[in-house]
Amino acid sequence: MEIKIAEKNNLSARLIVEDVDTTFMNSLRRIILAEVPSMAIDEVVVIENSSMLHDEILAHRLGLIPLKTDLDSYNLPEDCTCKSELGCNLCRVSLTLDVEAGDSIRTVYSSELVSENPNIVPVSDKIPIAKLAQAQKIKLEAYARLGKGEKHAKWQPVSVAAYKNFPKVKINEKLCDACGKCVEICPKRVLTLSESGKKLELRNIIDCTVCKDCVGVCPTSPPALEVSWNKDVFVLDIESTGALPVERIVLEALKILNKKAELFLEQLSVKKDEEAKVD
């Protein structure tokens, strides 16, 4: 397997994954969504709330605020040595919110959550939590823990995880007369004419949706274009919520997938040994 970075910015990446099949890509995608842990508020103790929001709605909103995650410093609650429902400083982070509207209406933002760990904070300071009327107040303490998306979507480290087969477009230059009809109909502008206008060229083939509209409008018979996809090369699009860098998400997913494969082989070996003893 080989992974190449086609595009990347602070929150998203487009990767080209080679020498794998659909089964592998589907497993990787599901693990990214459901099993790579991230930090999220899991419990809220409301001390005072005179806003229009019910306590449970307020807690729900807090739970959906993405938090920056430190996988190296914290344990999953079920793996922590404290074995406590309350948690400890190795599996839980406390955040407080103490705001009051005063004489005017105001909006409470995620920037006003105060964390005991400066590394575990909301990914954005501009996420609105509630709107307070005059003299209304919210005072609470929230507890964030590591969790997995398979339990609740608030623990998913990504907002997008999708893949497709890498497109494959072949141009038969002997048949193509550069009429330009395929260029006009291509929704992703993958096809273009050369500067001289006498030759059909490809650009950004990774954007091709394999719609085959270009093949349908080609006036030659047979068409001068062949559009298909590579069976063992894929394009993986990932958009992080900001909880973890994209690279860390992919690496953690690959580690988890590798552990699952090792466990399966181990169990398979044990099963074969048991059957051999019976025989």
What is each stretch, according to the model?
Residues 1-279:
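Protein-protein interaction/assembly regions in multi-subunit complexes
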